[in-house]
Amino acid sequence: MLEMLERGILMSVQTMNHPPFLTGDAFRKRTQTRCRGRANSSTALQLSSDESGNYAEPCTSLLSQPNTIGVIGGVSLLSTLIFLEKLACWGSRNGKECPPFVVSSDPALSKMLSLRGPLPSARTRFDRIKLNQDLVIENLRCKRNFLQQSGARGLAMPCHLSHAWHSEISEDSSLPFLHVGDCVAMELKNAKLKPIHAAGIVRIGLLTTDSNFVASYYQERLQSQGFEVVLLDKATEEHVLVPAMEALYRKDIEGARNLLRIAIHVLLVRAVNLVLLASDDLLGVLPHNDPLLRKCIDPMDALARSTIHWAETMVKQILACLWMH
């Protein structure tokens, strides 16, 4: 588990006009330095763990600030923790105070989807998710309600798979709920990328281990901003990407790296500008100094930046209203 966390933290991405995400010891030292002087900060962390997936309603809101971020934990606890580290990094840049946040995470999702243990086949994984998706949606809606009752004023969900049900989770809620696909699309649009093939459309590659659930919403959100999303063909997915995941589960890191490099190259030769690594399993596989990572994006970086931007905008709006009155 610690090895997986380390791989996630060491993932180095260089996205558009933003500086590369800090990695390894430098990243941890910065986070520790930023947080050391903030012991009295209003940032709050609520990790609620309930095997049943039920949440006790708080008597009063934990936080009352209008820029409080609510983080809905997904299938992977490690991914949630890495996202919180991203929030801390971007939220405390230039000496700023990290916005307050409250988090809800529990082991019920992995249990519902039976994703623990040996790597299931793609078909088995798909069947398990489809069979239990109603329970998953209810679990995530309970988390949303818990966060709202705890004082969250905006929501983020650092889980690619959970975003497949973003619209269902956000029903009957008035809170702003950022979508990772929108965040990526907006950053790509602001980067003003130039097409590198004759058709004149900027192509973005997508690698995911849950293409049946994840690919459609990335295609929808990016196509709405004028991008073409390019996926692996079925043969390459079955003979390259799936074996890469199998190698990773066998702890054959070098084998997984070589296969992932092949998958990325397959997309690059199809004239994509960048490749989205839209899977927790894919992040951190390549070493942080691998030149291929300059062509890869962790979509959760875009979600973290957009979340911090929302929180900072809320503060500016309130200050503007106070100044006017």
Segments predicted by a language model, with ranges:
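Non-catalytic structural scaffold of enzyme domains
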Residues: 1-325
